Amino acid sequence: MSFTVNIYYTGKNGSAKEFAREMTESGLVNKIRAEEGNERYEYFFPLDDPETVLLIDRWRDQQALDAHHKSEMMEEIAALRKKYALHMRVERYTEIL
């Protein structure tokens, strides 16, 4: 069963938006979208919070997400999160059958 992961990245002085920009411009976003089992990977900027970025990340199943978490890209993502001193909040959702 597919599921969606919402990740809220929060920083200071525009760092969350810079993180999303660098993720996109570095090609990491396209690599993740090309991974087996990834169904959606998109960043959004809340209208009422300039210091937060929402990532909506959808996976076919837990196995696909586990493979993503074991990929080398996770080290790159973690390094960027550290570079921009971001805090994360994660929510997981499944479809209503």
Predicted regions and their residues:
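Glycine-rich beta-strand-turn "strand-cap" elements at beta-sheet edges
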Residues: 42-51, 76-97
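Short amphipathic alpha-helical segments
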Residues: 15-38, 73-77
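A general secondary-structure signal for short beta-strands and their flanking turns/coil
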Residues: 2-4, 52
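Short, glycine- and small/hydrophobic-rich beta-strand elements in well-ordered beta-sheets
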Residues: 29-53
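Structural beta->alpha junctions
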Residues: 10-14, 59-60
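Active-site-flanking beta-strand signature of metal-NTP-handling nucleotidyl enzymes
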Residues: 4-10
